[in-house]
């Protein structure tokens, strides 16, 4: 009885232990088993020291999903993926070799965390979702993928959320292609990379701003394990970034040492959650070339927030301080150009107190200056003339110039007439 039991356990162990994959029927190689290739090329098998064909899309391009199977990423929301050591630990267990072994949120039922390469939740290094806006998978190149979502608590849970940027544009006809990427901690197991490609779609898209061309990520975060306790923000890659292609025979874009792997976390400026600065208009002032000596840290512009905060122009032809229909009083206040006129200035020009919270259009400096010297009625005209005559008389006396008796008398007579 014991030998039979041990044989059953031995047959079961390869299916429940070791490594992790993204599981969904939209993925390439969804039904690949240990016997499909001359070598073990199941989706959970890690990738290291391989040729480009062997590691790119896990060499599963000849095992595509059904044309209509897509994984949906809702713009501005979270998409929940299933990460597990075996398909039987997911909701797709009915097509697995070992049947249903689900155990709640456990990514690797019956196995310790070392099977998914971590010593604990404090030792996880993050994973990423990347997208290529191309429906023909054969046309996609490594530099076409852009990381758009990162979960730094990965791998730890079977159900893993990936926040999607709100401004993700829609996919082309035929959909997009995405890929899940992971590089684990060096504290538990040998180093590798993980990649599972799949058909995907962006749902609920309201923006058509394209993604920027992704660049290679750079090591810039605090790295105390390798003698660098402080981050170097100037050395970071900002904006759209490529996935980390590392430790292969060819096709690498990262060349870190085996004992210092790259990660999808702050070490390479992959912030947790949606990567909201990956669009062509995210950095209107440009991005400086990264280097350890660079001191300028660019700040992305949240174009969506700016657009929402900008009031729509009024169609009534009113002044710039007028708000559009439906705008709040706050929006009207903030859209007024220049400072508000003081209460004193308001009363002087209208004779009334200014309504609370309502700005008064301020005259330009030139216009105000002109009005100071315009007399609006006959009495003021007389007063102005008297003032001018008195000014002329005083200037004449100061300069020692003598007017003709008739002119001087006329001036004095005009002053006396008042």
Swiss-Prot record:
MF GO annotations: metal ion binding; monooxygenase activity
Signal peptide: 1-18
Biotechnology: The unique enzyme activity of AA14 family LPMOs involved in the degradation of woody biomass in nature offers an innovative solution for improving enzyme cocktails for biorefinery applications.
Gene Ontology CC terms, in alphabetical order: extracellular region
Region: Disordered, residue numbers: 307-364
First-listed, main subcellular location of the protein, grouped into a coarse class: secreted
EC numbers, comma separated: 1.14.99.-
Top-level enzyme category: oxidoreductase
InterPro entries from the UniProt entry: LPMO_AA14 (IPR054497)
One Pfam family from the record: LPMO_AA14
Sites carrying sugar chains: 31, 94, 151, 201, 235
Compositional bias ranges of the Low complexity kind: 307-343
Coiled-coil residues: none
Cofactor, free-text remark: Binds 1 copper ion per subunit.
Disulfide bridges in this chain: 85-108, 127-154, 171-176, 178-200, 220-236
Subcellular location(s) per record: Secreted
Protein family (similarity comment): Belongs to the polysaccharide monooxygenase AA14 family.
Protein name: AA14 family lytic polysaccharide monooxygenase B
Species the sequence originates in: Trametes coccinea (strain BRFM310) (Pycnoporus coccineus)
Lineage: Eukaryota, Fungi, Dikarya, Basidiomycota, Agaricomycotina
Name of the gene: AA14B
């Amino acid at each position: 009885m014991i030998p039979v039991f041990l044989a059953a356990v031995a047959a079961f162990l390869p299916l429940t232990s070791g490594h992790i994959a993204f599981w969904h029927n939209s993925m390439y190689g969804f039904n690949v088993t240990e016997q499909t290739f001359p070598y073990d090329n199941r989706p959970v098998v890690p990738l290291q020291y391989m040729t480009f064909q062997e590691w790119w899309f896990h060499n599963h391009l000849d095992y595509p999903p059904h044309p209509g199977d897509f994984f949906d990423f809702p713009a501005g929301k979270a998409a929940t993926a299933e990460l597990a050591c075996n398909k039987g630990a997911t909701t797709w267990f009915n097509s697995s070799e070992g049947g249903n072994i689900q155990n709640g949120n456990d990514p690797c039922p019956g196995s310790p965390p070392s099977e998914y390469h971590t010593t604990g939740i404090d030792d996880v290094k993050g994973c990423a979702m990347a997208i290529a806006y191309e429906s023909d998978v054969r046309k996609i190149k490594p530099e076409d993928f852009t990381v758009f979502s990162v979960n730094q608590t990965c791998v730890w849970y079977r159900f893993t959320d990936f926040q999607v940027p709100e401004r993700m544009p829609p996919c082309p006809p035929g959909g997009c292609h995405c890929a899940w990427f992971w590089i684990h901690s060096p504290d538990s197991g040998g180093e590798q990379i993980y990649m599972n490609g799949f058909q995907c779609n962006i749902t609920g898209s309201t923006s058509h701003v394209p993604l920027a061309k992704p660049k290679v990520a750079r090591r810039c975060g605090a790295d105390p394990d390798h003698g660098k306790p402080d981050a170097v923000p100037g050395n970071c890659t900002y904006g759209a970034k490529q996935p980390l292609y590392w430790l292969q025979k060819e096709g690498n874009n990262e060349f870190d040492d085996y004992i210092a792997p790259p990660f999808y976390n702050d070490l390479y400026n992959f912030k947790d959650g949606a990567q909201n600065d990956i669009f062509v208009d995210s950095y209107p002032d440009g991005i400086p070339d990264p280097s350890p000596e660079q001191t300028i840290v660019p700040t992305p512009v949240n174009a969506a927030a700016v657009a929402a905060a900008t009031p729509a122009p009024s169609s009534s032809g009113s002044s710039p301080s007028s708000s559009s229909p439906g705008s709040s009083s706050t929006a009207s206040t903030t859209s007024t150009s220049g400072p508000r006129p003081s209460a004193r200035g308001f009363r002087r020009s209208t004779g009334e107190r200014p309504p609370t919270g309502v700005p008064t259009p301020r005259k330009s400096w030139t216009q105000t200056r002109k009005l100071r010297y315009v007399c609006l009625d006959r009495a003021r005209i007389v007063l102005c003339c008297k003032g001018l005559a008195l000014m002329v008389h005083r200037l004449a006396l100061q300069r020692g110039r003598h007017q003709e008796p008739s002119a001087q008398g006329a001036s004095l007579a005009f002053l006396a007439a008042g």
